[in-house]
Amino acid sequence: MPPFFDFLMSAGIAFFVFIISAIILPGFFIWIGLKVVGKERDVLRCGMANFAAVVITAVVAFILHFTPLVLLLPLLAFLIYLYVLKTLLDVGFIEAFAATIIAGVVIFLLAVILLLIFGVWLLFTPPPAQMMHVKF
């Protein structure tokens, strides 16, 4: 057996983790935003459109980083992101904006709920036992 025999298996696991973390989860939140707006799109299509929009925006922002548009670059990058997202998802500009805002609110509320759950869990978890006769 070669030493890197299960390289494909480990690359497969890394690939699936990448797909889930970079495409499926953001696509799910964009899908929720589009569902609230009233548009029907697949989660995978939303995820791929979001991933492509982020990559294109990063490339354009990298190029514009060398210009004196430092103060306007975040707004310009967000507008480029919205334009690419609306083009790939076949929705209007306002609908793409609303979907991203709704997705951001959903992510924020999910983070608050998880923080509350883990905060209560940490509040009522007993502290670890003290190590006796140990000096640091």
From Swiss-Prot:
Name the residues that span the membrane.
10-32, 44-66, 70-89, 102-124
Going by the entry's taxonomy, the superkingdom of the source organism is recorded as Archaea
Q: What cellular component GO annotations does this protein have?
A: plasma membrane
Q: Which UniProt keywords apply?
A: Cell membrane, Membrane, Transmembrane, Transmembrane helix
Location within or outside the cell: Cell membrane
Does Transmembrane helix show up as a keyword for this record? yes
| Keyword check for Oxidoreductase | no
Topology with respect to the bilayer = Multi-pass membrane protein
Q: Would you tell me the protein name for this molecule? A: Uncharacterized protein AF_1013
